[in-house]
């Protein structure tokens, strides 16, 4: 196991590199939303060849198995799901 290593940010991806890779076929960004298996995600496959782990997103979600990728979306390297804890603003009536 690799412990005490600096976890680096995953590669940037998407239009104008405004997103980050969340898995080999997932690219998400606050302003972009998420791309799945598109040309925007091709660069994310390069992560598979890098020796160090990476992390995207800031806030953990999905039972701490993923992190917030875009407004209302939680992603892990397996996929993404809707998660209200990732909403940009939680409105109170």
Curated annotation (Swiss-Prot):
GO cellular component: extracellular space; secretory granule
UniProt cross-references to Gene3D superfamilies, sorted A to Z: Neurohypophysial hormone domain (2.60.9.10)
Record key words, sorted: Disulfide bond
UniProt xrefs under InterPro entries: Neurhyp_horm, Neurhyp_horm_dom_sf
Paired cysteines (S-S): 10-54, 13-27, 21-44, 28-34, 61-74, 68-86, 75-80
GO molecular function terms listed in the Swiss-Prot or TrEMBL record: neurohypophyseal hormone activity; V1A vasopressin receptor binding
Family the UniProt entry places it in: Belongs to the vasopressin/oxytocin family.
Summary of the function given for this chain in its UniProt record: Neurophysin 1 specifically binds oxytocin.
Name of protein: Neurophysin 1
Naturally occurring in which organism (per UniProt): Struthio camelus (Common ostrich)
């Amino acid at each position: 196991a690799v412990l005490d290593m600096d976890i680096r940010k995953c590669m940037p991806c998407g239009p104008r590199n405004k997103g980050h890779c969340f898995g080999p076929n997932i690219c998400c960004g606050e302003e972009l939303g998420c791309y799945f298996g598109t040309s925007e995600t091709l660069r994310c496959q390069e992560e598979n060849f890098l020796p160090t782990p990476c992390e995207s997103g800031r806030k953990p979600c999905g039972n701490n198995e993923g992190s917030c990728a875009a407004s209302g979306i939680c992603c892990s390297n397996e996929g993404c799901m809707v998660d209200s804890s990732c909403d940009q603003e939680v409105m109170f009536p």
